[in-house]
């Protein structure tokens, strides 16, 4: 289970979800869909050899931070208050986290850079060929199953 996403689910439980700036977008993929793609690539041939694919859930233009936060809220049966934090705010929080938790800080300046990168969406034309693979698990369903797993295993 992705413990980075877990924090988003945990905060959503309290009705509040701070996220990076509005302009960021990202592509997502369910691990089972990714595993199916890796298995489909095993019998290497000219069609797939020496190629770089960028798989995702098939959502054109990816997910905004706000859309992802609201979808996690729906998976949790909540409607969280989504707060966009600026890069400068996230950097201040990261420095404070470092002062308090030292080397165990969860939010680091490196992570802030990663989180605030504006475009983590797959490159147009880089998805795997439809004849080879296509995603089967919608992100909304995957997030709902993840929320249930967290509940069933007493993480939430």
Language model: regions and residue ranges:
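Flexible, glycine-rich beta-alpha linker
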Residues: 1-7, 16
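Residue-level signal for the nucleotide or nucleotide-sugar donor/cofactor binding architecture
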Residues: 3, 26-32, 63, 134-138
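A conserved catalytic-core signature of glycosyltransferases
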Residues: 7, 24, 110
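Short, hinge-like loop/turn segments at secondary-structure boundaries
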Residues: 7-11, 99-102
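A conserved pocket-lining segment of Rossmann-fold NAD(P)-dependent short-chain dehydrogenase/reductase
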Residues: 10-29, 33, 37-41, 45, ...
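Mid/C-terminal beta-alpha module of Rossmann-like enzyme folds, strongest
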Residues: 44-107, 137-156
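Active-site loop of classical SDR/Rossmann-like NAD(P)-dependent oxidoreductases
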Residues: 65, 92, 106-125
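Residue-level preference for well-ordered alpha-helical positions
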Residues: 73, 128-130
């Amino acid at each position: 289970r992705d413990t980075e996403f877990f924090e988003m689910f945990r905060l959503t439980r309290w009705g509040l979800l701070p996220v990076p700036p509005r302009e960021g977008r990202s592509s997502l993929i369910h691990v089972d869909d990714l595993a199916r793609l890796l298995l489909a690539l095993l019998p290497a041939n000219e069609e797939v050899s020496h190629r770089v694919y960028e798989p995702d859930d098939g959502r054109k233009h990816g997910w905004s931070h706000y859309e992802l936060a609201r979808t996690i809220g729906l998976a949790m049966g909540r409607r969280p208050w989504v707060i966009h934090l600026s890069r400068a705010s996230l950097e201040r929080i990261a420095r404070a986290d470092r002062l308090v938790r030292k080397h165990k800080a969860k939010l680091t300046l490196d992570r802030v850079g990663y989180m605030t990168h504006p475009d983590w969406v797959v490159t147009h034309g880089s998805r795997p060929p439809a004849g080879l693979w296509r995603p089967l698990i919608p992100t909304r369903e995957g997030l709902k199953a993840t929320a249930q797993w967290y509940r069933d295993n007493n993480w939430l």
